[in-house]
């Protein structure tokens, strides 16, 4: 609905309109107009038109359809690159724009092709390339989660964060960018991950000192998950060297690069280059 002027949908329950409208309101799309048609072509046919934010508690007949009208649809992003200043930041650390672009590229996320194959061993029909399930561990302001959500409409991004101030920023940024496929989970990653579906892709920007436990949990859920990690401190970089052994144990590829970004800034009438902190980026899988 974010990217289209009109979206029509069939409804299967009396509370379905309310649930959709609640979700739209949560992500800052409460001003979308909703037209609900109940029992169309019957003598008691009824048409209701209201804003989504005003339909969060209403119930409708099970025989209903709805049209969602967005007067200000946004063009769909084809590549990452939201400017840092666009995010609501506070004092919470944020993965910067250039690093985000490399991280997202290294995650290598692909959307569901819709192709279904029959697996002879299990006797079941299986999706050849399922919709992505992405963890953002230590999500901070949500800059990576937001970019991933906007680029991966078929998937779900789980933003995991333990700091209350950061969780507030996650909600604020999700509403600002109108992201509907991003779930925010407050708590320690090692306690949250067991409750989630198996991931296809994981970004770890912060681990709270539980990196190896988190890695074990991820591989227990999906040994083929693709994982990207970043580190700025020497202590975290030292931990990353151990990840090479973990990758070998799980028989997955391991790659480590260092990224150093230098940005221009104004100094009176002049322009100078200012170096940012170097960042280590590890890719596994």
What are these regions (language model features)?
Residues 5-8, 198-206, 213, 226:
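Short SAM/SAH-binding signature in class I
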Residues 6-91:
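A contiguous loop/helix-start segment that scaffolds small-molecule binding in enzyme catalytic cores
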Residues 112-120, 131-140:
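Conserved class I S-adenosyl-L-methionine
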Residues 125-126, 141-153:
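Conserved SAM-binding loop of SAM-dependent methyltransferases across substrates and taxa
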Residues 130, 150-156, 221-223:
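Conserved S-adenosyl-L-methionine
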Residues 160-199:
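S-adenosyl-L-methionine
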Residues 161-166, 206-207, 232:
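Short beta->alpha hinge that forms the Motif I/post-I loop of the SAM-binding pocket
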Residues 215-278:
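C-terminal substrate-binding/active-site "lid" region of AdoMet-derived donor-dependent transferases
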């Amino acid at each position: 609905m974010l990217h289209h002027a009109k979206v029509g949908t069939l409804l299967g329950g009396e509370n379905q309109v309310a649930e959709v409208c609640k979700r739209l309101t949560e992500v800052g799309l409460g001003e979308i107009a909703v037209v609900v048609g109940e029992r169309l072509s019957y003598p008691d046919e009824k048409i209701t038109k209201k804003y989504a934010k005003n339909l969060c508690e209403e119930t409708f007949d099970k025989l209903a359809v709805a049209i969602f009208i967005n007067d200000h649809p946004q063009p769909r992003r084809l590549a990452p690159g939201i400017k840092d200043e666009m995010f609501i930041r506070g004092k919470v650390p944020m993965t910067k724009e250039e690093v985000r672009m490399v991280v997202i590229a290294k995650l290598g996320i692909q959307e569901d092709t819709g192709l279904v194959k029959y697996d002879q061993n299990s006797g079941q029909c299986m999706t050849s390339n399922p919709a992505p399930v992405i963890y953002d561990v230590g999500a901070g302001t949500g800059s990576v989660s937001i970019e991933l959500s906007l680029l991966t409409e078929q998937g779900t991004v789980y933003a995991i964060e333990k700091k209350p101030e950061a969780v507030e920023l996650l909600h604020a940024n999700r509403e600002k960018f109108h992201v509907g496929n991003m779930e925010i989970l407050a708590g320690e990653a090692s306690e949250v991950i067991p409750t989630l579906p198996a991931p296809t892709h994981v970004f770890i920007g912060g681990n709270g000192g539980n990196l190896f436990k988190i890695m074990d949990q991820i591989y227990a859920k999906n040994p083929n998950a693709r994982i990207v990690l970043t580190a700025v401190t020497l202590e975290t970089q030292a931990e990353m060297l151990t990840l090479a052994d973990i990758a070998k144990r799980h028989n997955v590829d391991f790659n480590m690069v260092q990224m150093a970004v230098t940005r221009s800034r104004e100094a009176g009438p002049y322009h100078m280059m200012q170096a940012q902190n170097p960042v280590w980026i590890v890719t596994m899988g």
